[in-house]
UniProtKB/Swiss-Prot annotation:
Signal peptide: none annotated. GO terms for cellular component: lysosomal membrane; multivesicular body membrane. This is GTPase IMAP family member 5. The keyword Magnesium does not apply. GTP binds at residues 33-41, 54, 151-153, 188. The gene is Gimap5. PROSITE patterns: G_AIG1. Residues 24-227 form the AIG1-type G domain. Belongs to the TRAFAC class TrmE-Era-EngA-EngB-Septin-like GTPase superfamily. AIG1/Toc34/Toc159-like paraseptin GTPase family. IAN subfamily. It is found in: Lysosome; Lysosome membrane; Endosome, Multivesicular body membrane; Endosome membrane.
Amino acid sequence: MEHLQKSTYGTIVQGPEAHCVQESSCLRILLVGKSGCGKSATGNSILRRPAFQSRLRGQSVTRTSQAETGTWEGRSILVVDTPPIFESKAQNQDMDKDIGDCYLLCAPGPHVLLLVTQLGRFTAEDAMAVRMVKEVFGVGVMRHMIVLFTRKEDLEEKSLEEFVTHTDNRSLRSLTQECGRRYCAFNNRASGEEQQGQLAELMALVRRLEQECEGSFHSNDLFLHAEALLREGYSVHQEAYRCYLAKVRQEVEKQRRELEEQEGSWIAKMICTVKSCWSSHTAACALLIVLGLTLLTTFINLCISRCK
């Protein structure tokens, strides 16, 4: 696209796969979100090739974590697709293995967690997926998150900024604020210049995120364990892999408790704020309660009169 300004990283080009995890300059992107939200199709759009199996249906076809590579004008890019591990019903005996393998594929840690959600369809399941991402990767993960909306074509004449700004979905508004208003949209059926433009927008956000994080990637104790296992060669030492999965279980449980403590602390602060407001504005609060009860009584009487 001639009028499109290139980012620092340039444009995606196809090429042979490489183990770019070993390269210090490798950009690691981890796809997260609920099942069937379009993670695999988004990965294919980023790489501009059918690297991940993707079907147009509401159920996930990704059963295990999968890593594929591409380049962005000389810089290697690793894209990791994930199985259904970010939802409450995903708790099963293979959960530890799925999470552990995901850590191994994007060790020493992702620069970007790309939360994929369908435009206009941010549901309670999506909100649960966000919470599960925090449980799996730690409460600090939002610092490295970008929200990517699929079905960009549904915007029609409306801009994405307008959609996000005027949405009445409180959970979505809270999410975009929490991740620093880093979001973009993809039409995963796009090709040519349209696809190129989408990629340029995403990479501009990636560049902004890396500047904000001073080039750092998301890491925690479990990523350190994953790196140690990779150095040992876990394919040969199965006992080391079993010990690693035990650490996965322990660390995820620890991160879950930390998240609950953080949420509990926030609720406690809100209660203290309400109490403070009540004690200093007792008369005003009492008046609001009386007015509320009056309006409720009037509404009930109106409903009764209409039913007669």
